Design a protein with these regions (language model features):
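Bacterial N-terminal signal peptides
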Residues: 7-15
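Short helix-capping/linker turns of helical repeat alpha-solenoids
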Residues: 36-39, 57-59, 72, 89-92, ...
Length: 178
């Protein structure tokens, strides 16, 4: 259970809370929801707004919705739907976060490897803020494929969690100079 909690803490640290294109209302609701302040109604209002935008095809809002549902409100299973939708549309951050969810919640290493493959392809190496995620995604894709290949010798989920932490530690300590 501790590893799941730690993985979600990592998601919170690694992910942008809301996309750069958030409205002032969305940002205010997010801040009220995030800070607790007894404003659960702010969280539900934010989910309502993001859900409508996600349903109308705004994939960045699907990414935001998955983040808020999964991290802020602990609705981890419900977070899969908007994250899957935005990952399929090529939103790299959703694919990265979905990979974490796949390992930690569902134990689906094959699916996590697939999602990291998409994130590896979609993150830009030219944008400094995305480069570290590209490096991590590409390394995780390879590591998880190895975990799946060697599953007769060890538990692929344990292997995937170990690989995730090793790769995260490596890139977090070495910055983006790899």
């Amino acid at each position: 259970m501790r590893s799941i909690s730690v993985l979600f803490l990592l998601i919170m640290i690694l992910s942008c809370p809301l996309s750069a294109k958030s409205t002032a209302e969305e940002q205010n609701l997010y801040n009220e929801c995030n800070k607790g302040n007894g404003k659960y109604s702010s969280c539900t209002k934010l989910i309502e707004i993001l859900s409508k935008k996600c349903d109308s095809g705004n994939m960045e809002k699907c990414d935001d919705l998955g983040y808020v549902m999964g991290l802020e409100l602990g609705m981890r299973e419900a977070a899969f739907v908007p994250l899957e939708k935005s990952c399929k549309a090529g939103i790299a951050a959703s694919c990265f976060n979905l990979g974490i969810h796949d390992i930690a919640i569902r134990g689906n290493v094959k699916r996590a490897a697939h999602n990291y493959s998409i994130a590896c392809e979609k993150y830009s190496e030219r944008l400094e803020e995305e480069r570290i995620f590209k490096l991590k995604s590409c390394a995780l894709k390879t590591a998880l494929e190895n975990c799946l290949r060697d599953q007769e010798e060890h538990d692929p989920v344990k292997c995937a969690k170990k690989a995730f932490w090793e790769i995260s530690d490596k890139y977090d300590s070495n910055s983006t100079k790899e």
